[in-house]
């Protein structure tokens, strides 16, 4: 089943810096505190574990100055490339930080995946105080 790219944006309060949030998006320790139960890395391959489900991804790009990171999912059954990308942007006027997530889902699973992102972002907000 073909997956379509979509983005969701979450506004985080301005009481913290992009650098503080960035460590939760770009390190195995940070990712395992909100995104997955456990995250390990071997060179550029990340292993994400959620209870009994394991998924691997290759680190495709990381920009510590633009606060952008992309992981390409290593899925044998997929005919095309899918990835998850995290972008942090700061609004010059409000000073709010936005987390923009790019992901892929089939039409039938998109709503469930957005609900999952909403839940995960609430965890991220709790641990970062945003």
Predicted regions and their residues:
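Hydrophobic ligand-binding cavity/cleft-lining segments
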Residues: 1-40
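Short, charged low-complexity linear motifs
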Residues: 6-9, 19-20, 96-105, 129
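Hydrophobic pocket/interface hotspot
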Residues: 21-22, 31, 46, 59, ...
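Short coil-to-beta transition motif at edge beta-strands of beta-rich domains
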Residues: 40-47
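Hydrophobic-ligand binding "helix-grip"
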Residues: 49-94, 98, 102-106
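A conserved amphipathic terminal alpha-helix motif
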Residues: 102-130
